[in-house]
């Protein structure tokens, strides 16, 4: 059976781990993060990195809201006719058609441009991080008035460009820039500047990782045969990673209060090892599995997590991916670990980008951080991957009921210390 689930925070601020996304992919039928079929006009030859963006960040001092409490004093005009809108997308390093962050974000921009009657969406793929700023500026120079930048790595350059170009709207996917009182990126991480006030033309898209993690926990506990499930995060200094794991544990225990949920982090200080080292992830997971004996393992560690899934596959246990449908993204990257992935906890990137582009054109989008969760179809869980038949109708009902509970508030997916590692 194929899992059909549709639901809609990474509260983060700075850059560190690359994320990919793009167009032209064939997506599996699902109400979760369905991507438009429009293909990118160009696809660079660089191999996709196929990693989720669980980047290190500094936690903002206030929770993001869909509508920031501070009204911007000025913002770019949203009264332009459809023909006046021009949308550009700057992806992270990799390819547009990576079945990951770049692809789904790009497809959301294409859908949004179609909704508002704009022309073809232009896309730029950097060869490396040094090109972020110049590619963003190129779109400014060529008259694009909605610029979508994909992933945490572009947060600083996006904020700098937004400050310098108040007549252009910027959509930062999975971004919450830390800015000072002038609106510039704050290297001291004081984050004293208010985004909505100082960057009234910037929208940072954030997601409820705890809700997506909760759904993954439901699946894990439901398919576990030995009542022991595990989760490995990249580092406990990233609130988004911690939220995923906290939600996962609560979701698993909602199915089986007596289940053993073992969680750990690959590193406590080294972000490179935490998110960009598949070998370290595999070695860590090998020992984790040997020591704790889970028969389901959830990864929240970017590229490092790909190694975690490889370890799970080698050990003959089930894997759960993160951020995007990793059954597809790892297969696209020729990583055999995809064969063991039952499902993935998703951020609905295409849905959220499309909604934001459409709202900008309609004049209803406020600046600051926009929060996507179950209520607005911002998060979800992937169709069943390699574990064909594992997700039964009964498990699907548990998932559907949990989504309904998230929407009406009866299901709590994160403790009071949400996002803070104990």
Language model features with spans:
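Post-signal peptide N-terminal segment of mature Sec-exported envelope proteins
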Residues: 28-54
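Bacterial N-terminal signal peptides that target proteins for export
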Residues: 1-10
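Bacterial signal peptide processing site
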Residues: 21-24
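A residue-level marker of the well-folded mature domains of exported/periplasmic proteins
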Residues: 44-51, 55-422
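C-terminal motif of bacterial Sec signal peptides marking the signal peptidase cleavage site
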Residues: 16-19
């Amino acid at each position: 059976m194929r899992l059909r689930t549709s639901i809609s925070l990474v509260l983060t601020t700075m850059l560190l781990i690359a994320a990919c996304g793009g167009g032209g992919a064939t997506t599996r039928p699902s109400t979760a993060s369905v991507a438009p079929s429009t293909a990118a006009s160009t696809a660079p030859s660089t191999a996709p990195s196929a990693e989720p963006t669980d980047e290190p960040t500094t936690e903002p001092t206030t929770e993001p809201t869909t509508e920031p409490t501070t009204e911007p004093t000025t913002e770019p005009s949203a009264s332009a006719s459809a023909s006046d809108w021009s949308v550009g997308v700057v992806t992270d390093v990799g390819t547009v058609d990576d079945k990951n962050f770049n692809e789904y974000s790009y497809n959301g921009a294409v859908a949004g441009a179609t909704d508002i009657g704009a022309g073809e969406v232009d896309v730029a793929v950097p060869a490396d991080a040094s090109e972020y700023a110049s590619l963003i500026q190129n779109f400014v120079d060529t008259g694009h008035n909605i610029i979508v930048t994909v992933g945490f790595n572009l947060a600083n350059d996006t904020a700098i460009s937004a400050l310098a170009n108040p007549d252009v709207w910027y959509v930062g996917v999975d971004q919450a820039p830390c800015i000072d009182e002038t609106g510039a990126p704050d290297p001291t991480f004081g984050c004293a500047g208010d985004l909505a006030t100082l960057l009234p033309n910037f929208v940072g898209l954030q997601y409820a990782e705890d809700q997506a993690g909760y759904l993954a926990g439901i699946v894990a506990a439901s398919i576990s045969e030995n009542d022991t499930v595990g989760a490995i995060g990249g580092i406990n200094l990233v609130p988004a990673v911690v939220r995923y794991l906290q939600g996962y544990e609560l979701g698993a225990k909602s199915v089986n209060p007596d289940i053993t949920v073992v969680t750990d982090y690959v590193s406590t200080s080294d972000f490179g090892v935490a998110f960009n080292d598949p070998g370290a992830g595999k070695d860590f997971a090998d020992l984790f599995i040997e020591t704790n004996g889970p028969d389901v393992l959830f990864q929240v560690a970017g590229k490092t997590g790909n190694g975690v899934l490889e370890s799970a596959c080698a050990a003959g246990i089930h894997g759960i991916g993160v951020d995007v449908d990793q059954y597809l993204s790892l297969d696209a990257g020729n990583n055999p670990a995809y064969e063991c992935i039952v499902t993935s906890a998703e951020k609905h990137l295409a849905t959220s980008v499309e909604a934001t582009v459409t709202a900008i054109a309609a004049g209803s989008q406020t600046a600051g951080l926009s929060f996507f969760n179950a209520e607005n179809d911002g998060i979800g869980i992937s169709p069943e991957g390699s574990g064909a038949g594992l997700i039964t109708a009964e498990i699907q009902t548990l998932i559907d009921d949990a989504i309904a509970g998230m929407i009406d508030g009866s299901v709590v997916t994160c403790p009071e210390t949400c996002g803070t590692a104990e």
